[in-house]
From Swiss-Prot:
It comes from the Archaea. This is Phosphoenolpyruvate carboxylase. Belongs to the PEPCase type 2 family. SUPFAM superfamilies: Phosphoenolpyruvate/pyruvate domain. Its EC number is 4.1.1.31. It comes from Pyrobaculum calidifontis (strain DSM 21063 / JCM 11548 / VA1). InterPro entries: PEP_COase_arc-type, Pyrv/PenolPyrv_kinase-like_dom.
Length: 459
């Protein structure tokens, strides 16, 4: 089958609670109603049953869906460097077992790829590839079933790792014949670590240089963009922003369809997003200049220094954000943010994003002080050339900025910078009265859900 274009995921970015027991039927609906040709069963920091890929196979067989031909299941593993080793091995086993049953009952391979998240080194990637190869060989030798080759997709989720894509891919695939490989670029975790500006520039730069990587390594790279609804997480699933984001992040082949765009917006709005993503696929993009690299470094440093000032407050609010999937708590599996000599355990991206919105200051606006510096040094035009949708993203998020609430939860310094930036850009910094009313109510789980329903995404 051809490489998929729309990957349905199990992200907890919706205000609607979806249990693991409901995810098998959800996968079938993704194939049949939402037009996704790929469903990602997720084990990263998530208590997904190891039988789930097999259950999707059996449900698809019963429904007479052409799994393995038109539709495919992709499994996201835990990274054995970050979670328990046995969880990664059990997730690999779940992928191979799914193929055992799909070959046995349908004569096709349902799983052609697994995703390894948080890739930062070649060794972990090589380990997973070796273990997967052994499992496949064991099934062929002992069960007499050829479950086929399953490829490992590296997921780069850090701005500086993405900028090293050429070196990492060269190590992983050196000596292999020319073929198509899939590369997953994640926006969300990179934004948590480095801020919106740095993470957006890193992905845009990386996408613009993949042609060089293909030529030098003899590969055909098919990029996957992992992005959600808010601008901080890429905005590619946002009905208002998607037609512009596909231009900003041109060069992708596949895009994620996360939960909020399926559960928190009307079907006709989802269809607009789907159409924009499909129409924007594979468009060429201009080569980003090397000057971007210095801005990525500076923006990341400024962002991390700023977030450290407010980390305790954001963590306090984050504890109120409900989980709408059966994920492991972020206190057990979160993200590490380093600023100076301080290291802070932060929530994962969706909870983190939701918490910032609940303070009255959307996280894209944390770059405001640095953006003012860029404007004064005549470098803002370079950013806007590489990120043509950036001003629209700021304009969008200023609708959820409330000065009084942000001053209450944070302080006047960051609020002043946001207001000054909005004035400089000629944008209005004022929320809808209904949303402002919700922001000024006491924070609790119900209030955070209500804020998310208004925005049409939790985080």
């Amino acid at each position: 089958m051809p490489i998929p274009r729309l990957m349905c995921t199990q992200h907890p970015d919706t205000t609607v609670k979806i249990t693991a027991a409901e995810e098998v039927d959800e996968a079938i609906v993704a194939f049949t109603a939402y037009g996704c040709d790929e469903v990602m069963v997720d084990y990263e920091g998530k208590a997904t049953p190891y039988s789930q890929p097999k259950e999707v196979v059996m449900k698809a067989a019963k429904s007479e869906l052409p799994l393995g031909e038109k539709f495919v299941i992709t499994v996201r593993l835990p990274n054995p460097r970050l979670e328990e080793f046995d969880r990664a091995m059990l997730a690999l086993e779940a992928a191979v077992v799914a193929n055992y049953f799909s070959v046995k009952y349908m004569g096709v391979r349902a799983v052609k790829w697994v995703v390894l998240p948080m890739v930062e080194d070649v060794e972990t990637m090589s380990l997973v590839r070796r273990m997967l190869k052994r499992k496949v060989e064991d099934y062929k030798a002992e069960a007499k079933v050829d479950v086929g080759n399953i490829e490992v997709i590296p997921l780069f989720e850090d701005a500086f790792v993405q900028l090293k894509a050429k070196a990492l891919l060269g190590e992983v695939f050196k000596g292999e014949e020319v073929r198509e490989v899939r590369l997953f670029l994640g926006k969300s975790d990179s934004a948590v670590k480095h801020g919106h500006l740095a993470s957006a520039l890193a992905i845009a730069y990386t996408l613009s240089r993949l042609g060089d990587v293909e030529s030098e390594l003899g590969l055909r790279i098919r990029p996957i963009l992992g992005m959600g609804s808010p601008p901080f997480r890429g905005g590619l699933n946002n009905p208002r922003l998607a037609p512009m984001e596909v231009v900003q992040y041109a060069g992708y082949y596949t895009a994620t369809i996360q939960s909020a765009v399926r559960y928190d917006v009307a079907l006709e709005e989802f269809l607009k997003v789907r159409e924009a993503i499909l129409n924007g696929c594979c468009a060429p993009r201009q080569r980003a200049p090397d000057e971007v690299l210095h801005i990525v470094q500076e923006a990341s440093a400024r962002y991390r220094a700023l977030v450290m000032k407010y980390a305790d407050k954001v963590i306090e609010v984050a504890r109120l954000v409900p989980s709408t999937r059966d994920r492991v708590s972020w206190t057990a599996y979160g993200r590490t943010l380093t600023g100076g000599e301080r290291v802070v355990n932060m929530p994962r991206a969706i909870v983190y994003t939701s918490a910032w919105y609940a303070t009255g200051l959307p996280p894209t606006l944390l770059d405001a002080p640095y953006l003012l510096e860029l404007a004064k040094s005549d470098k803002l035009d370079l950013v806007l050339k590489v990120l043509p949708t950036y001003l629209k993203e700021l304009e969008y998020d200023l609708e959820f900025f409330d000065r009084a609430t942000a001053e209450k939860y944070l302080d006047g310094e960051i609020v002043k910078a946001v207001v000054e930036l909005a004035d400089y850009l000629g944008l209005e910094a004022r929320p809808n009265p209904a949303y402002a009313t919700l922001l000024r109510m006491p924070r609790n789980e119900a209030n955070i859900i209500a804020l998310g329903k208004y925005r049409k995404f939790l985080g």
